């Protein structure tokens, strides 16, 4: 199941308590204090990871507590640090304070991480309190508690382009035709129940991310239908592709449908209504005479706006206009990326090649399984291991002849 909003409480690990101990050793009178410090509690880190597409792992667990630090011990032995708790979230996750509602952090880049709660500091042992005036201190410190945070995590998909429109307008079909995404497609409204993302490869060097959200209906901004729950997924999109069906199955007017969606965007977020928009009439094979297209174009000519520069017609069934549409989208996306770079903003690119390379740890065999010369070079083996024991033909161990290093 798809989860894009969860409420979680995090608690970092408590620091370990300091130890009160005195050195007790034979022939060492008045050994003095030797209590070690407690270890620092574990912190909780959130990391944006490629391949994580939902907040489902947080849906059934509402409280995360990190490991405590170890207690200090005698002989000046410090407690061990708590093991860091690292949790992976999708790129585009916003961390919001549940009490005040302000955004604490936006994780938008692959590999970006944020320490949501820091572990408590370990307490000092009594050895720390030794002074010339107090040679045998009998005091220590308790470990400090770890930070606690109650947050809401919201997933806002990292998409360059957002597909919007009425239910059954052909959004999922278009996504499946121009990308490798395979959303559920059927001939009834509200087939799409959660957002789908697809990467559209224009050529070897150019690509963009397309987000398909459930269809919007009148009253969506007030909680009617499904689309209002997922409008946040197009908030980051710099371009909206508004799909219009020429002959809606419910017999509604395409122009009125377009106006209704625009009003819902305005009610949800005024910045979305002012976003760059490309209007596309889908299923053009159902309008062979071009009558609906002429009506739509006439409406846009009478109501000029920045968001409706022109009208395009496509057919996902016959591939009419798809190549031209993808080219136009790529041009607008590239222009926006250039504007972001000029403004000092790094565009978010989610590709497999962008993922941070994690060095592989060398696998070491336990001593009882490792060969006698497995960790040595051939040169060392030849010079220093000539005296190694060998097996005779009878299966008995025959000691080798040890070489004199001085010779």
Swiss-Prot record:
Chain residues that bind Mg(2+): 172, 192
Originating species: Rhodopirellula baltica (strain DSM 10527 / NCIMB 13988 / SH1)
Function recorded in the entry: An essential GTPase which binds GTP, GDP and possibly (p)ppGpp with moderate affinity, with high nucleotide exchange rates and a fairly low GTP hydrolysis rate. Plays a role in control of the cell cycle, stress response, ribosome biogenesis and in those bacteria that undergo differentiation, in morphogenesis control.
An individual GO BP term: ribosome biogenesis
Localization, UniProt: Cytoplasm
Enzyme Commission code: 3.6.5.-
Protein name, per record: GTPase Obg
A GO MF label: GTPase activity
Positions contributing to GTP binding: 165-172, 190-194, 212-215, 282-285, 315-317
Family annotation (InterPro entries): G_OBG, GTP-bd, GTP-bd_Obg/CgtA, GTP1-OBG_CS, GTP1_OBG_dom, GTP1_OBG_dom_sf, OBG_GTPase, P-loop_NTPase
Stretches assigned to the Obg domain: 1-158
Disulfide-bonded cysteines: none
Recorded name of the encoding gene: obg
Family: Belongs to the TRAFAC class OBG-HflX-like GTPase superfamily. OBG GTPase family.
Boundaries of every OBG-type G domain copy: 159-334
